[in-house]
Amino acid sequence: MQLSVVIITFNEEANIGRTLQSVQPLVADGKGEIIVVDSGSTDRTVEIAKSRGAKVFVEEWKGFAAQKNSAIDKATGKWVLSLDADEEVEPSLLDELTFLFQTPTTTDDLNARFERVRALTYLSTRQSRKQIRLMMKAQGNPNSFFAEMNGYLVARKNLFLGRWIRHGGFWPDRKLRLFRRGTAIFEDRLVHEDIKLTQGISGQLRGSLLHHSYPTLSDYIDHMNRYSSLGAQMVVAKGKLRFSFINIVLRPLFTFVYNYFFRLGFLDGREGLLLHMYHAVYVSWKYAKAWELSRQKNTLSS
């Protein structure tokens, strides 16, 4: 089997159908499979996933990294495409993924494929494009170089209130999404789990994912509340516990000014203003909650 699409879910009925529909051509006719690991959804997520041909596994929540690694462990394809439930494969990326799974047989095929992959790098050594071309030429065998290609970074178009946010650090937001099975692992973090390619080299694809992240302000405020609590735990773990004017007021203000003005967030209109304003509030919440946690610990220990 060529490809396994893996997704973790919890109450994603508003998103999962769109996501699965976008990858159907990649897995049709036995070319691949869809693995969904659900953590006890109470809506129609599981029903929708099964109706789209996904293999659904229901497991207790173990944390983002552990849950995603569990989904990867269930994959049987040579390649794994790891998606969030609110991500959609755009047509251009779909074409590129289809192309990448074709096996080159001649030098011309190899060169054509190379032109479809931009800024190939070693994740560890950041090897230059020129060096990689020399490697390809030295190896001679058209298949040998791409045998070492173990992962691809994919850009994400983050949507906020329906608008693609192109500035302020939100684009291109590249993530390692496609990798050979057995060559990547998610590393556990309280906030924003990270995936690491453990061997081989990685490239960047030209196509992108649509990330339907925050369709409403309520969604973003809920996200801010959850992630500021997790971020506060990280702050406490680092020992930055003091309630200070810098952390509660100046740091959020600097965050807003930097992202909105210096990183051109103002070019994203009203949506950009709201996003960066609320992101600054998130920073303030994070440090305020860290102070609250430290105060609670001091109360319990006294």
Identify the role of each PLM range.
Residues 22, 34-47, 84:
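A conserved acidic beta->alpha catalytic loop
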Residues 80:
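Short aromatic/hydrophobic "clamp" motif used to bind/position activated sugar donors
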Residues 44, 65, 83-100:
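Acidic donor-binding/catalytic loop of UDP-sugar-dependent glycosyltransferases
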Residues 59-75:
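Glycine-rich, basic loop-to-helix element that forms the pyrophosphate-binding segment
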Residues 72, 91-294:
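Catalytic-site signature of metal-activated, phosphate-bearing donor transferases
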Residues 7, 12-26:
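Short, well-formed alpha-helical segments that are part of the catalytic scaffolds
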Residues 30, 51-53, 76, 198:
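Short, structured coil segments at secondary-structure junctions
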Residues 2-4, 33:
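Cell-envelope/extracellular polymer assembly enzymes that use nucleotide-activated donors
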